[in-house]
Amino acid sequence: MQGSRRAAGESGALLAGSVVNGLAAYGFIALGTWSLGAEGFAPVAIVWVFWAFSAALLTFPIQHWVIRQMALDGHPGGVRAALGRVALLAGGVALGEGLIALAAGRGLFGDGSWVWPLCVTGVAAGAGLMGLVRGVLAGSGRYRAAAVAIGGENLVRLGVGAALLAVGRSPGLLAAALVTGPLIALLWPRALCLRPTGGARPATGLVGAAGLSVLLAQVVLNGGPPLLAALGGGKAAVTALFSALALFRAPYLVALGLTVRATAPLTRRVEERGRGSLRVPALAAAVASVALAGGAFGLAWPLGPPLIRALFGPGTAPGGAVTGAVAAGCVLALGSLALTVMLIAAGARRALVLSWVAAVAAGAAVLALTGDLGPMGRVVAALNAAEVVAVGAGAAALARPR
């Protein structure tokens, strides 16, 4: 009974931290759109998208690799032994994203200022740090501390952003506030001081596989605004799509925080009972996500646009059909997230990567074949096609007998 209460309390703390994280994200976006307008906020939205990609490449996979490795080892020694390779990965990603932002600065941000690549590099480096800190806290069973880390990151951004906008209404200043979120990690300096055990260094291939897979997942879910800009969508349309995604990703953001509670138990379940023990949960997640996506489409078509305008201001909402399709895609993303965590817990690197490669290929095919829908319609159709394939492929991989 005491163990159940403790687990419920820890899950409740993670839920609260995830909700705070989501609300602070909304607050940051609303602060930007109301202060800078739809067009003024557009370059900040692009930096936000880079941060989402960084979280996909670094925060999520590092966090879950740390939790899984500590569950298998029973101590952080293996994580400490492989930390150098993980740091090189994080540094390479940060440098690569910064160079991309520098090379494509005018097309993405509207000018060639150094502010944008510096901010992009900063958010990427911070994403790696947060993955390590959150993973060590959760892997050590300190779920309440992990909840504070999850919720506090965007609270720091919101507070710093409000202070900087009080100094001057500049998109560059607001983008700089995004870099400050990982300062919350300073509350747990010992999370970065892991003791070596002298054992063999564990394989870090799962970090790369999960990083690639979750990057592809975030390209699908968060890549719409820059893709829309590349296809010729105006700044107002980019902000409208970003605002719709920001609203309907709320459950996804909450679920991201809760996944840290699931990885260790799922890992132990697979170790004790085999990968087949995940067959029923995988199929249930797939069926539920498809069914709920249909309901989300029907509700968001009429109700979504006025809600988006109320939250983020005039000119920030797409049409009803697009809004409904964005909502459906975000619900499908919840299912693909659940299946991704199951595949990570099972150590199924090949199936994990292949499921998301297939999803991106499906999205690209739909994007190429729907030219008559216009830029916004093509992007949203590709989102839904990719998520459907990701859900189906992930469930099929876990349902296959081994």
Short names for language-model regions:
Residues 6-63, 208-235, 383:
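Signature of the first transmembrane helix
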Residues 38, 104-120, 235, 302-334:
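Interfacial segments at transmembrane-helix termini and the short loops linking adjacent helices
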Residues 126-148, 328-355:
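Membrane-interface junctions at transmembrane-helix termini in multi-pass inner-membrane proteins
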Residues 9-22, 47, 51, 56-105, ...:
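Membrane-water interface segments that mark the loop-to-transmembrane alpha-helix transition
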Residues 58-74, 244-248, 252-273, 344-345:
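Helix-loop junctions and terminal segments of transmembrane helices
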Residues 48-56, 229-236, 241-260, 296, ...:
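Transmembrane helix-bundle signature of multi-pass secondary active exporters and lipid flippases
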Residues 114-121, 147-194, 358-362, 374-400:
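Hydrophobic alpha-helical transmembrane segments
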Residues 1-7, 144-149, 171-172, 177-178, ...:
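Interhelical loop/hinge segments that connect adjacent transmembrane helices in multipass membrane
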